[in-house]
Swiss-Prot record:
Record protein name field: Putative pre-16S rRNA nuclease
Family indicated by similarity: Belongs to the YqgF nuclease family.
GO annotation, biological process: rRNA 5'-end processing
Main location: cytoplasm
Job of this protein: Could be a nuclease involved in processing of the 5'-end of pre-16S rRNA.
Subcellular location: Cytoplasm
NCBIfam families: RNAse_H_YqgF (TIGR00250)
Keyword field contains Cytoplasm: yes
GO cellular component: cytosol
Amino acid sequence: MRVLGLDVGDRTIGVAVSDPLGFTAQGITTVHRKSVKEDIDELKKICKEYAVELIISGLPKNMNGTVGEQGEKVIEFCELLKSELKMPIKMWDERLTTVAAHRAMLEANLSRAKRKKIVDKMAATYILQGYLDSI
């Protein structure tokens, strides 16, 4: 069963997919947001291409565990996505995933320009891998 991981932001959506057995996550793309309809259409294509059966979306939480304004936006988008795709979507605590992605890229000596291009799909990979490791 393939699982899709999402890091939903205001301007971009990082996307990762699991291997067919559900052991590892690989970042595949960053969707540059245009409109909710276009964003959902793009994710629909990806789900079809990879035969995805479950979506894991990162849920931004405050450090005290509460859901803030950005978390509410992500929940709202995921509800729309779920109704369009007719597919289960689970929310996953994404605290510090972007920080971890930046740290890994700094350790790999990637330039600022390269980091900016891939940080969202790297964060999606961390979110999805965290979920896969928990099951």
